């Protein structure tokens, strides 16, 4: 699950995972651009969610963090992705038993180069791969 952004969703994922006898890998989604229309926990509330997931949900395995930056220019992408990397690294230190590398999912077709430069380990570039020259995907 790449969009865990609230304690309520964590509780429901835990409940469903228990019901089906599974452990679910999750990424906590952080609204790094603080956009009201986008989902994700605000940066200042992320630590509380990390502590809740790591401390109270044995069926959820925190693997890392994800964000979707607002559309912008190179400077704004670099700034936001740098902020996200630093925040994610500090939050990852709170994660017990960090036996695997942290997943840092950020960057899309317009911004993945900046995201990778700031440490992204996962990018979403569907449009860059599948769009025709006119921007259409069909």
Model-derived regions: residue spans:
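Conserved alpha/beta-domain cores
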Residues: 1-112, 116-118, 130
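Active-site-proximal glycine-rich helix-loop-beta segment
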Residues: 119-121, 126
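EAL-family c-di-GMP phosphodiesterase catalytic domain
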Residues: 122, 131-133
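Active-site loop ensemble at the mouth of alpha/beta enzyme cores that anchors a bound cofactor
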Residues: 136-138
